[in-house]
Structures are given as C-alpha cells and as structure tokens.
C-alpha cells in the first residue's frame, strides 16, 4: 500500500512538473472563461485527434461544474500543419486538466484586439499613391506598371469589406467571418478603407489584384485574439487551395497586447509562403509590446507624414521594417465614395498593395518581398524614433517590368471622388494569372486596427518610454492631440459594451 501511494505521488509530481504554462495577462482585457490552447510542434494529427476526444470526455465529466458557464466548449480549431491548437470556453479546473497534457505547449487567455480609433478629415489632398512612385514629396501623379498586381490575391484581415464598392470593380469577394455576428458587412469602414488602398481602381496600388474579405473584427472594430488566429488559419488554407500561398498577400491593420498565439499564427502563415504586412501601432511607443507587430517574420510598417517625417502617432523601435504613407490617407468608404483616415492602419495596406504589385511584376514571394521593398525604398524618413533600424520609405521606383506611365492621383474631395482617369495602357510587364478558384463560404471573425495622429503642422510628441511589460490589452492604437481617450476607453472597455458584444459569455 505504501509503495502504491509512493508511486502515485511520484506520478503526480512528474505530471505537475511537465504541465504546460498557463500564461498570465494581468493588464489585458480578457474574454471571460475564453482560452487559446497551443499544442507542441511535434504533435501529430493522431495526437491532436486523441486530445480532442479526451477534451470532449472531460467536458462531459465536468458538465455539472460548467453549468454556470454559457456556451462552454471548443470554438475554433487551428491547423497550420506545423502548428495545431484550438480556442474555447472552459472552466478553471478544465483548463488545469488541459495544461497537464504533455502535448500542450501553453494555454493563453483570450484577449481583445481592436481597430485603432479613426481620424477623419475633409478636403485633404491625397498624396500616398504619388509619394510611393516619386523620388520627392509633393508630386501629384502615381506611376506604375500596367501589370498592376494581376494574378495576386490580397486578404484583408480586418472589419470586413464593402465588396460592392465601385472602386473594386467586381474583383473583391467575401471570404470568412470569424466574428460570429451574422453580419457580413463592414460596419466600421476601416476594412473598406484599407482595402481600397491595396487594390482599388482609383485609390489603390495593385489595381488588378483580387481581394478576399476576412472579417475578424466586429462592427465596433474589436474582437478576441482567438478569432484573429482563426482568420489567419482560414486565409492560409484558402490560399493553398486557390492558386497557392506564393501568390497571396495578407494585410493586418490591427494589434493588441503581446500574444504568443497570435505571433505563432502569423509566423506560420509566412513560413507557408504568404507575405504579411502588419501595422506597427499608433501609441508612439516601442512596437515590440504589440502583436502581431512584434513577430520578426512579418513586415512591420510604421507611418509617415507628407513631409517624410515619422507620423507623430506611429510606433517605433527594432520591430519596424519599413515606413509608408499613413497620415491623412483618402480611400474607399462603405456605400460608395471616400473618406480620409490616419494611422499605421493606413500605412500597412500601402505595403501590402506594393507587395502584390511586385509579386506580379517580378515573380517574387514570401519573405523575399519585404527584403525587396527595403531595396527599392528611399532613405527618406526623419525622426524615426529610438532604436528604429530603418528610415526607408517604400517606393515602386526601379522595379523591373514594363514601361510605367503616370496616372492622376485620387480626387481631393473625400466625399465625392471624381471618375478615375487611368493612364493609356503601357507595355505590360510579367502578366499574372486569373483569380484562382472560388472563396470558401463566409464565417465571422474578430480583431482591431490603429487610429489617429495630431493635426498637420503640429510637432510630434516626445517618444514614450518602452513599457515595462508587454502584457497589456489587445486594443487599438489610439493617438493624436485631439483624440478622446476617456470616451474611447469608456466606449470600448466599459462593462455594457462587452455585455452587448459577448452576451453569451455572461450569466
């Protein structure tokens, strides 16, 4: 009896020692009882299936304990070939049981990610398109090769897209909705704006690329990390089955507190051949405190102003790869027409659009695209911020291909854009392929982007010091002297907001 008791205690000690880490997010806004579980890299499909069967059995056994938790159980399942995991609603004891499985790498509380607060300004001249194709600021024409991203698919992981907007010319399709709100539209306007910059006929860079809308943020611009990871997984699988990940670009104008799960998902997408453009954030602080901007394998983008200075709101630091226009950018809005927004959310789609353009023109893909963007860019940005290793502003100049001709920039009136006047066809470069296949049926998604800056002409605030801990909430990157912080936090983090958005999680 004593021997049996000794063995039992020893096994319990070994189990406890090998238990996966349950990560703490003390400063983050978490979704009640919601967790993300990541399996170890060597987990086979059989191991994963066995774990899921065990989890179902555990839920059945703990049914009385979970009676007070609504909608308990698995919600998303992730399978990136080399990375497997899932998310769900679980009670504390079940989470402890999950962590004891030797195949589990870590368990992470599900946190909220949001779009960055938006800054809208009327009658602002458009300048971003012209800047990336001219050597000096102040130009008013966009010069590009007529291949214009043809054959490349761009995935907008955002608040959704008005796919019927005239600027998309029928090249945009609905893909997936990870928000589970049953609302396949862009109620925020953020996703339509970023998509217009990427592929729009008038406002866009890659004017012949296809667009797939993947909604991971709700109409209020926020959503849990678990849904964003699911959105990334969906994009990778869709690209693999529809033309290949080497002809796919993903834009993520969103961010929040540091998340191992989100960074690992982004890294898996890059490893499997996709190009990811990610907004650095709008807090005027070190971008290493945010995910997915802190993931080294993605292309992390800071924002520049019209005078080639770093935008006053833009994050900085070692995580940044490039800068792109992000202040007072005019692009499409839901329902037709246009509007002006500012933020690193506006800078990232310039990089995503130019990536699609270069992939079609030069036949490059994946991680090579960010390196090529650095080669083509100009060393123009001033006041890059502490520890920032680059002052490169993106440019399409010098890209090999056909003979580019200038095209007029977008209309300066954001409410009533004029009919776009495209240049006469130039000698084409490397032609791309037609859009490969049909999208998967839609489903909901969560996540969020980055907001405003101070008015033009104001001096930029001194950079904020590096936060002592990377564990703060996945929230938008607000910024700007006129930004209503009190109203923002009350709106997005007040109890009533979350009760309405995640009502099923509350008793």
Swiss-Prot record:
SUPFAM superfamilies: Protease propeptides/inhibitors, Subtilisin-like. PROSITE patterns: SUBTILASE, SUBTILASE_SER. Residues 405-428, 438-449, 462-476 have a biased composition (Pro residues). Residues 175-198, 282-312, 378-486 are annotated as: Disordered. GO terms for cellular component: extracellular region. Secreted subtilisin-like serine protease with keratinolytic activity that contributes to pathogenicity. This is Subtilisin-like protease 1. It comes from Trichophyton tonsurans (Scalp ringworm fungus). The lineage of its organism: Eukaryota, Fungi, Dikarya, Ascomycota, Pezizomycotina. The gene is SUB1.
